[in-house]
Regions:
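Low-complexity, acidic/polar, glycine-enriched regions of mature
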Residues: 25-203
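Bacterial N-terminal signal peptides
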Residues: 11-22
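Bacterial N-terminal signal peptides that target proteins for export
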Residues: 2-13
Length: 203
């Protein structure tokens, strides 16, 4: 009887350990907040066929929920203030804020919410919903997770880079003018470049 009881206890302990094991292995993702002082949200668009114009958004916030050790991401969300657009040209920036383009009076923010994340041999692919001028479209970001490190002030930081593209006409930005050569002043495709640094939230 004692021997059988001892065996039963060993079985119960083994089952308990097996039930606990997945929880121990699959760590809960941590919240990492975007540090705008060390991040860049940049876009490029063809200008008059022969060159590119580059701009940035200066006011934004966001977060990444991830397990940094495993490099797995559960969520990415971001909000960008459209009025913060900056192409280093005041007149052009005013035009971009107008109803011809971003229409900041009626649509003060751009939002992104991740739907799926896949690790690849080259880095990762993140697919999500981008909402701009009241229109929501799916876009794909392809990039790299650059790892995590401690800064001199005790914060843990992680870095991401990514690129994507969209067609501005999909979001109602159809303004253009035709050149004498037959080309257009502004290209339809907008290239996106992100360099994002995040700080791990204190637990």
């Amino acid at each position: 009887m004692l021997k059988r009881t001892g065996q039963s206890w060993r079985v119960l302990l083994l089952l308990g350990a097996m039930a606990w094991l997945p929880t121990a292995v699959l760590a809960e993702p941590a919240r990492w907040n975007v540090d705008p002082e060390h991040s860049t949200i940049e876009f490029r668009v063809t200008h008059m066929v022969v060159s590119k114009t580059t701009g940035r958004f200066m006011d934004y916030a966001g977060f990444v929920d991830m397990d940094a050790e495993a490099g797995t991401v559960k969520a990415i969300e971001a909000t960008i203030k459209t009025g913060s657009v900056n192409t280093n040209h005041e007149k052009r920036d005013a035009h971009l804020r107008s109803a011809d383009f971003l229409d900041v009076e009626h649509y003060p923010t751009i939002t992104f919410k991740m739907k799926s994340y896949k690790k690849t041999a080259e880095g990762y692919t993140a697919v999500g919903d981008l909402t701009l001028r009241g229109v929501t479209k799916e876009i794909t970001l392809v990039g790299q997770y650059n790892g995590a490190t401690k800064d001199p002030w005790g914060n843990t930081r992680a870095g991401f880079s990514a690129e994507g593209k969209l067609n501005r006409k999909d979001f109602g930005m159809v303004w253009n003018k035709t050149l004498d050569s037959g080309g257009l002043v502004v290209g339809d495709e907008v290239q996106i470049r992100l360099d994002i640094e995040c700080i791990k939230a204190k637990s």
